[in-house]
């Protein structure tokens, strides 16, 4: 009943949507014997990616767009195109996909001994290290114009700036923080528990997807995705079909929140999210203040004013320690999804300010 509305929501937060014409074809980069932070070695770590535009002769027009939760490489097309912040005629855009999204190496597509629940937890730093190799080995790229990321993509952008401080000219972060703070871990643990409590989950060795657990996961997620004001003002009516009610909207959200997603994949990426903390980067002694203070490129930090995943106060706290930061909250009732341009007003705000930041020269080192 709410299929059109659900598709809108999934596109808005980057879980799907059509590719731009003649661009965005996905490819695989495979790393043999890739060693994770945990010490586990993946025999063939696969990173899916797509590119838009043309790499220039100097190889200096590259912008990296790392994916967010369960997203594919098409999750940033609200930012790409003529008249938007990232014109493929000017930039060579590389969009990558996190481990665990079901296409890059994931519990659902990896053979024994790392199949299903035996797939090792991967960190944000593992993902960044793999993409660093992709850029150098597959594309011959040694420097980036920018790293731009929404949500878990923003987590990766922060990690890039700490791990590879001279590899890019600037970073843009929307609806994300440099660390998953305790309240965020509470949310993620609640969603993991919701899936694992379903007897059909069978400790991850299920024969069919644990439907009840996935619906419980979706119900919790729905309560955090948008702001209280979004529900109060019934902003869901903007794209809902005629006759939709609060109940049909909520039912449509939780009953099939991420169509086709695998439970172990969902959990793997939540574990990645939980462990995010740039302070635990080797050399910083688990001190996030030191890690943030090491960032030597300009940062455009755009939290959503109503994000329940990444509260704006957490962003304000982190900016105290970042040397060259512009904090620009997104004035929106669309909660977490504001950072992915989930409506025309937020899309214009993001494109205008990210586009201006990309063109700015005075504050660049």
Task: Kindly give the residue locations of the regions a language model identified.
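N-terminal cap/lid subdomain of alpha/beta-hydrolase-fold enzymes
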Residues: 50-113
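Conserved acidic catalytic loop of the alpha/beta-hydrolase fold
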Residues: 114, 125-145
């Amino acid at each position: 009943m709410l299929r059109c509305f659900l598709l809108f929501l999934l596109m808005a937060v980057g879980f799907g949507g059509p590719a731009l014409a003649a661009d965005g074809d996905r490819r695989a980069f495979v790393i043999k014997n890739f060693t994770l932070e945990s010490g586990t070695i993946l025999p063939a770590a696969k990173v899916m990616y797509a590119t838009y535009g043309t790499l220039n002769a100097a190889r200096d027009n590259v912008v990296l767009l790392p994916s967010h939760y369960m997203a594919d490489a098409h999750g940033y097309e609200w930012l790409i195109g003529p008249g938007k912040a990232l014109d493929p005629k000017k930039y060579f855009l590389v969009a990558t996909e996190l481990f665990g999204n079901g296409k890059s190496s994931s519990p659902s597509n990896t053979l024994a001994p790392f199949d299903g629940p035996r797939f090792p937890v991967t960190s944000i730093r593992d993902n960044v290290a793999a993409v660093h190799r992709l850029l150098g080995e597959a594309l011959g790229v040694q420097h980036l114009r920018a790293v731009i990321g929404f949500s878990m993509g923003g987590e990766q952008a922060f990690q890039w700036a700490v791990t590879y401080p001279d590899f890019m000219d600037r970073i843009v972060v929307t609806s994300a923080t440099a660390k998953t703070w305790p309240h965020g871990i509470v949310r993620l643990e609640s969603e993991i528990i919701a899936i694992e409590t379903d007897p059909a989950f069978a400790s991850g060795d299920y024969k069919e997807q644990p439907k009840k657990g996935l619906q419980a996961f979706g119900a919790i997620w729905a309560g955090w995705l948008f702001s209280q004001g979004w529900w109060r003002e019934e902003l869901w009516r903007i794209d809902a079909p005629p006759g939709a009610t609060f109940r049909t909207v909520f039912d449509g959200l939780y009953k099939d929140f991420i169509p086709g997603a695998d439970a172990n994949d969902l959990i793997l990426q939540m574990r990645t999210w939980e462990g995010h903390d740039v302070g635990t980067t080797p050399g910083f002694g688990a001190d996030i203040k030191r890690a943030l203070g090491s960032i030597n490129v300009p940062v455009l930090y755009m939290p959503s004013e109503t994000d329940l995943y990444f509260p704006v106060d957490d962003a304000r706290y982190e900016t105290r320690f970042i040397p060259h930061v512009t904090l620009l909250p997104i004035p929106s009732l669309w909660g977490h999804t504001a950072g992915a341009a989930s409506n025309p007003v937020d899309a214009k705000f993001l494109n205008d300010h990210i586009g201006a930041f990309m063109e700015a020269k005075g504050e660049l080192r």
